[in-house]
Amino acid sequence: MTIETRYATILLLLSGVALLSGCADDPPTPAEKAAAAAVPGAPPGGVADAEAKNAAASNVKESNDLVEFAYAYPREAAAIPEFAAWLDNDRATRRDALIATARRDKAAAEKAGFPYRAHSHLQTWQRVSSTPRFLSLSAEIQSYTGGAHGMTSFATLLWDRNRAKRRQPLDLFTSGEAFDSATRERFCSGIKRAKTAKGILVEEASDSPFAKCPPASAQTVWLGSSDGRYLDRMTIAIAPYEIGPFAEGSYKINVPVTGALVSVVKDEFKRDFLPIN
């Protein structure tokens, strides 16, 4: 073997070692993880767990002359199979309802000789917070089913990891009345401040439909966390027409998680809250 041949052979071997070393450092793909979880002796449910951990956020959109539909939820929800299944079913239910209403209204418009405007439902779930026990989601929904303008509404969901079940924030409290009593003062004063910030004079006439502060329990409650461990933040979303005319729009009122509020939390959930005082 000549010196040139020996040198070329050494270079080839070294490049092969480097290539193997580089391959060894590459992280396994989702498919490889799922395959590893499926081998004999792997823990039961390993394949499903591996697939769930690699689940992507869901975002379904549809737009045509009849409807505009969108429904999305984050990766954290997609990673919980039972929760994702419920969200997928909710999406299908809302889409079917939108299409049924749109077809009915389109037929009625054509019969009466009026133009039809596509109906819509646009809903995006977003993560509010994630603690060891709860995944908290919020949604702002834009919808249109005819008329002068569309509507804004809100939704809320909690996933209880300990019980593997879906909950509403008010499920964590002893009653809606107790929740209202613990939040009324801060909630109502928050509404007044929010209206003042918009330059709106707060109506106080007894005969005004918007003079009375509504019960917080009748609105949409979002529970959050500042540290990823405890529920210690709360926002109450108010849709248009609830406390003012449509032109005022919606409101989002931050209400502190006080000791008084935590005192009306059910015993099962008290350890998951952290009051500010």
Q: Whereabouts are the PLM-identified features?
A:
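Bacterial N-terminal signal peptides that target proteins for export
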Residues: T2-L11
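Short, functionally important structural connectors and interaction interfaces within domains
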Residues: L12-S15, K165
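Compositionally biased intrinsically disordered regions enriched in Thr/Gly
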Residues: A24-N277
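Residue-level signal for mature regions of secreted extracellular proteins and peptides
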Residues: G16-V17, S206
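C-terminal motif of bacterial Sec signal peptides marking the signal peptidase cleavage site
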Residues: L19-G22
